[in-house]
């Protein structure tokens, strides 16, 4: 029987699932087994019936084998689970749902937006995106894989409650994630059902508000990303705008005024059913780590599909005010820079931003983190921006090194296959964002250090001299010199730079084992090969 792998140092075991985040996961005093109906010794009598689960809000749920709403963030790998993940979100999920959908279409002719939000095509697209994103379960304990079975049983009931205005969103589940600058950031995880409904609203409302957003806003918008924001700042720096107003909003998502936000939404949305549903999501509350429920009179919970759109709606007046004053700026969610040519203008711009944010938006500017400084000294979206290039910030490099150290820790007792798989996925994701930097020296330095960490892991895993000798010979080391390395008393870190070890564990061989080649990825992004011209058709022979 294979030995179970141990978790990374400082992380929870993957087998523990979502239910054991931070060592506890309660819902008003009930255990996860009591909420989902999975038999754990204290569940209801219904939970002992095979394939039956008790949903805390919607009642009994017949779940096919392999689709029990377990506390997992990923499907279990069974054929039934894989099939469920590919299932379309059919509106005719339960008895009477087909007639309900028809009545909905006939009875909503006065509101095209509401009809579009609940249309089968829009709900199917919302479910597809939620399924692709995955994520942890909400307070009801239902995973993404278990949602199709839930919808087949209760889809008609959910649609009926949405239609007659009696649907009540569930509170979000509070979880904490570490910040790059230290401390922890609170996230609110909605249930899968609420994620689908929020995503359906966001898809339709996004088209309504997209035309109202500023060209200097780059977050959570189609065809725009953080790289575009960084390029815009670099273009401004190249024009001589080298002084920056680096303004930080104190806990923006936790301090959004609901009345102001709903007034902004109501400027474009007239349907009271849409406005009522958005307001209920804002006031749904949060279940804390200790199981207590807390009201949310202010703020937008981070973690839901609707939150990014609401953040852009809330901050659009700030964009328009800066544009009215002729300021050059770039905003990505609540992170933004205002660019000016000199220090005097920067001080004046800082006063304008503080007065508008605190007076009109009723938000707070974090004076400890806001400053006026040279652009090259400011960090924006993890990068330092100069006139001619974009560099990685020290915090971004430290984050990379810390994560790679954990993944290549000599005390993490897992196979090299799993270790390198985790390393490859992390490096590909990290570099996919930070590849915009044009600092070749940083790329080479990080790549060299990462490969040294991997060679250290191999040397540690081989342990004894005979094993090391046999492995080196198998990898092509010279027989007359291999004993010099295999019998060395030097530590693993020092041996990772040994010429014999490096000649055996070459960069090319490490790449075949799953170690990414950072210089090759960087060159492929910044200097892509030219497209080959299409071959010309042979000329026709002249007819005499």
Give, region by region, the residue ranges found by the protein language model.
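Short amphipathic alpha-helical coiled-coil/interface segments
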Residues: 151, 155, 446-454
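Extended C-terminal regions of large enzymes
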Residues: 458, 462-544
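Short, solvent-exposed helix-loop connector elements
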Residues: 295-300, 405-419, 429-442, 459-466
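A conserved non-catalytic segment of reverse transcriptases
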Residues: 283, 360-430
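Conserved polymerase palm-domain catalytic core
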Residues: 157-176, 180-181, 204, 212-377
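A glycine-rich phosphate-binding loop feature that marks nucleotide/adenosyl-phosphate handling sites
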Residues: 369-378, 422-426, 443-451, 466-475
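Non-catalytic, polymerase-adjacent accessory regions of viral genome-replication enzymes
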Residues: 1-152, 156
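Core structural elements
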Residues: 118-121, 171-175, 180, 282, ...
